[in-house]
Amino acid sequence: MINLGDKQSTIVVAMSGGVDSSAVAAMLHEQGHNVIGITLQLYDHGMAVGKKNACCAGQDIYDAKMVANKLGIPHYVLDYESKFKESVIDNFVDSYLQGETPLPCVQCNKSVKFRDLIKTARELGADKLATGHYVRKINGDNGAELHTGLDPAKDQSYFLFTTTKEQLEYLRFPLGGLTKDETRKLASKFGLEVADKPDSQDICFIPDGNYKSVINKIRPNSSESGKIIHVNGFELGEHSGIINYTIGQRRGLGIAYNEPLYVVKIDPKDNVVYVGPESALNVQEFIIRDVNWLADEIKDNEKLEVAVKIRSTRPPRLAEISKFGDDKMKVKFLCEEKAVAPGQACVIYAGARVLGGGWITREIR
């Protein structure tokens, strides 16, 4: 059994209704902690009640309450729909309209799940907030550090780079040293019916996978057609709205040409989609904004060799970073990388430790 090293205390567990957070609640309850389960209703969950493998659906709320009842712990469902729409859904829609590729799970962790839920946990008198994320919190010489989960296949550190130092001190991640199989075995040991429940796969507020319908519902008439232009300057055709395209996309362009073409750049101001050969996707350096830094302070223009991830599914790449201004950094790859997309996150690592990260801007070269 994993022990958090804490004395018996009051811990709020963010219970999504899945196996991970359910196992966390059971584990902490067995260790003698005063556990309070909280499940967030984040959107019109009626849309997804019948949808399998979607997070935060009505079934998930039911499952979380069922687990809490089995453990004999208090459980609350909090209506965060308005907070979620303002902080996550509206941001998601506006990001697409700006020609970006958004990352709503990071925005959700940053705002609703950590900022707002930590505030609620403190109001309930809780000493800590525990989640089912596969990351590790390690106490270093200068305070808490965020590290990758031991299981590379389940590591979620990329999605938690916006966690602040203050939040990290309050948070607990009991599953960071486990594999998914070990978590399921733990849930089975506790007799939890969700032990074999499938992982969520979809963006929770898009249960059918059709993000364009969500955008058009919130921002009607957002699919304005425009020009598709080759990076060499000549026009190739017409696009159906920039929300339908992302950097690196090859399929669905509707263009006949003598070589494969990829989306290289999206210009929301002029409503233009630029395409080119695969080589045009190569990137040497770019700028990130709204940097959240968790390590020792670095000076302006000081260069640091690190590893960076620009997509959750891509392996880390060696790069050199340098800070300028209050919240920006230049990231320069040691070897060129393909398809760096504005709106995605760039997360910075030193080995297993998350040093920080920021949002990729259009300043890409």
Curated annotation (Swiss-Prot):
<keyword id="KW-0808">Transferase</keyword>
<dbReference type="GO" id="GO:0000049">
    <property type="term" value="F:tRNA binding"/>
</dbReference>
<dbReference type="Pfam" id="PF20258">
    <property type="entry name" value="tRNA_Me_trans_C"/>
</dbReference>
<dbReference type="GO" id="GO:0005737">
    <property type="term" value="C:cytoplasm"/>
</dbReference>
<dbReference type="Pfam" id="PF03054">
    <property type="entry name" value="tRNA_Me_trans"/>
</dbReference>
<feature type="disulfide bond" description="Alternate">
    <location>
        <begin position="108"/>
        <end position="204"/>
    </location>
</feature>
<dbReference type="InterPro" id="IPR023382">
    <property type="entry name" value="MnmA-like_central_sf"/>
</dbReference>
<keyword id="KW-1015">Disulfide bond</keyword>
<feature type="region of interest" description="Interaction with tRNA">
    <location>
        <begin position="154"/>
        <end position="156"/>
    </location>
</feature>
<keyword id="KW-0694">RNA-binding</keyword>
<feature type="binding site">
    <location>
        <position position="40"/>
    </location>
    <ligand>
        <name>ATP</name>
    </ligand>
</feature>
<keyword id="KW-0547">Nucleotide-binding</keyword>
<dbReference type="InterPro" id="IPR004506">
    <property type="entry name" value="MnmA-like"/>
</dbReference>
<protein>
    <recommendedName>
        <fullName>tRNA-specific 2-thiouridylase MnmA</fullName>
        <ecNumber>2.8.1.13</ecNumber>
    </recommendedName>
</protein>
<dbReference type="InterPro" id="IPR046885">
    <property type="entry name" value="MnmA-like_C"/>
</dbReference>
<feature type="binding site">
    <location>
        <position position="132"/>
    </location>
    <ligand>
        <name>ATP</name>
    </ligand>
</feature>
<dbReference type="GO" id="GO:0002143">
    <property type="term" value="P:tRNA wobble position uridine thiolation"/>
</dbReference>
<dbReference type="GO" id="GO:0005524">
    <property type="term" value="F:ATP binding"/>
</dbReference>
<feature type="site" description="Interaction with tRNA">
    <location>
        <position position="133"/>
    </location>
</feature>
<keyword id="KW-0820">tRNA-binding</keyword>
<feature type="active site" description="Cysteine persulfide intermediate">
    <location>
        <position position="204"/>
    </location>
</feature>
<feature type="site" description="Interaction with tRNA">
    <location>
        <position position="344"/>
    </location>
</feature>
<dbReference type="InterPro" id="IPR014729">
    <property type="entry name" value="Rossmann-like_a/b/a_fold"/>
</dbReference>
<comment type="function">
    <text>Catalyzes the 2-thiolation of uridine at the wobble position (U34) of tRNA, leading to the formation of s(2)U34.</text>
</comment>
<keyword id="KW-0819">tRNA processing</keyword>
<comment type="similarity">
    <text>Belongs to the MnmA/TRMU family.</text>
</comment>
<keyword id="KW-0963">Cytoplasm</keyword>
<dbReference type="InterPro" id="IPR046884">
    <property type="entry name" value="MnmA-like_central"/>
</dbReference>
<keyword id="KW-0067">ATP-binding</keyword>
<dbReference type="Pfam" id="PF20259">
    <property type="entry name" value="tRNA_Me_trans_M"/>
</dbReference>
<feature type="binding site">
    <location>
        <begin position="14"/>
        <end position="21"/>
    </location>
    <ligand>
        <name>ATP</name>
    </ligand>
</feature>
<dbReference type="GO" id="GO:0103016">
    <property type="term" value="F:tRNA-uridine 2-sulfurtransferase activity"/>
</dbReference>
<feature type="active site" description="Nucleophile">
    <location>
        <position position="108"/>
    </location>
</feature>
